[in-house]
Swiss-Prot record:
It comes from Mycobacterium ulcerans (strain Agy99). The gene is metXA. Belongs to the AB hydrolase superfamily. MetX family. This is Homoserine O-acetyltransferase. InterPro entries: AB_hydrolase_1, AB_hydrolase_fold, HAT_MetX-like. GO terms for cellular component: cytoplasm.
Length: 379
């Protein structure tokens, strides 16, 4: 696969999902995935010079549907409604916002539930991927649309890891970046929680080593447990205790075998994910997150970050227990293009980057001002 500036496919209509064919993709591991498609949406018009693209990068279970109502092909509303649109922080009167469903996902892009060349689901044959592979796939999808440089990359959590790989691996292709609620590498705590989630899925008898897609049975119980555990790491401890304390759910009494309110809440989160996500994708993407390390093959984190010239805004959440502030502080300290850590005060934990709209919107404004400042300079 080579990056060309000659478009071979066209941008979708605003809000429409387009499956962009990028051909074969050689992974960081050396494995090759054939016939790769990346699901892509856009909002706003592409400028004649193709220099106003803002890539919006989703987190683990997100997709390309950043904004807009639920509807055909979108079982849920946009995951960042209010951040993209006319007059929004990513103002589509000025910018062309583009989002993909990540490689390995299950919302249109090639992943374990997709059909391989033999017409059967990839399942357990789907190779291990990395965050860098996801970035290469995104870049190839943009290149197929005639876009080889972007004004900004914006992402939180796994999206933040992708944004970091964009600016370190391809600094000549991006003018600015917003890194939210992420770190330079996966920590032992993150790897521990993530491998435990994977273990829950693989312990489900319906997992069948990942080859369950044609059996009519999915590892539903395992995926729901994984999501319940993950969701605890996404929210703040104070928030959860203030909402649920040790209360029973409705009229149920935990002392008599009834459920706790927090238990019911987490069960609901598991049910919601089950309705829209594939367990195989959950495993593949979570494994990629556990291997995230921007310093791998680049003489370590310090050298990788110090060598990145891209202007960047780094933001963290005060109550984030999955990606604590010390991880964003490291990024802010080592990236030459960062003026200092931006702290969002929130009790909502890691998910603060999704729900603290006013504060995060201001960080987006700062990021796009950096892109504007560089727009008149040679790349």
């Amino acid at each position: 696969m080579t990056i060309s500036d000659v478009p071979t496919q066209t941008l979708p209509a605003e809000g429409e999902v387009r499956l962009v064919d990028i051909g074969s993709l050689r992974l960081e591991s050396g494995a090759v995935i054939d016939n790769v498609c990346i699901a892509l949406q856009r909002w706003g018009e592409l400028s004649p010079t193709r220099d106003n693209v803002v890539m919006v990068l989703h987190a683990l279970t997100g997709d390309s549907h950043v904004t807009g109502p639920a509807g055909p092909g979108h079982s849920t509303p946009g995951w960042w409604d209010g951040m993209v649109g006319p007059g929004a922080p990513i103002d589509t009167n000025r910018w062309c916002a583009v989002a993909t469903n990540v490689l390995g996902g299950c919302r249109g892009s090639t992943g374990p539930s997709s059909l391989a060349r033999d017409g059967k689901p990839w399942g357990s044959r789907f190779p291990l991927i990395s965050v860098r592979d996801q970035v290469e796939a995104d870049m190839a999808a943009l290149a197929a649309l005639g876009i080889t440089q972007v004004a900004a990359v914006v992402g939180g959590s796994m999206g933040g890891a992708r944004a970091l790989e964009w600016i370190v691996g391809h600094p000549d292709r991006v003018r600015s970046a917003l890194l939210l609620a992420v770190g330079a590498r996966a920590t032992a705590d993150q790897i521990g929680t993530q491998t435990t989630q994977i273990a829950a899925i693989k312990a489900d008898p319906n997992w069948r080593n990942g080859d369950y897609h044609e059996t009519g049975c999915r590892p539903e119980a395992g995926l729901k447990v994984a999501r319940r555990f993950a969701h605890l790491t996404y929210r703040g401890e104070i928030e959860l205790d203030s909402r649920f304390a040790n209360d029973g759910q409705g009229g149920e009494d935990p002392a008599d075998g009834g459920r706790y309110a927090i238990q019911s809440y987490l069960e609901h989160q598991g049910d919601k994910l089950l309705a829209r996500f594939d367990a195989g994708s959950y495993v593949i993407l979570t494994e990629a997150l556990s291997r995230h390390d921007v310093g791998r093959g680049r003489d370590g984190i310090h050298a990788a970050l110090r060598g990145c010239p891209v202007p960047v805004v780094v933001g963290g959440i005060t109550s984030d227990r999955l990606y604590p502030l010390r991880l964003q502080q490291e990024l802010a300290d080592l990236l030459p293009g960062c003026a200092g850590l931006e702290v969002v005060d929130s009790i909502r934990g890691h998910d603060g980057f999704l729900v603290e709209s006013e504060a995060v919107g201001e960080l987006i404004h700062k990021t796009l001002r950096l892109a504007e400042d560089r727009s008149s300079r040679p790349w």
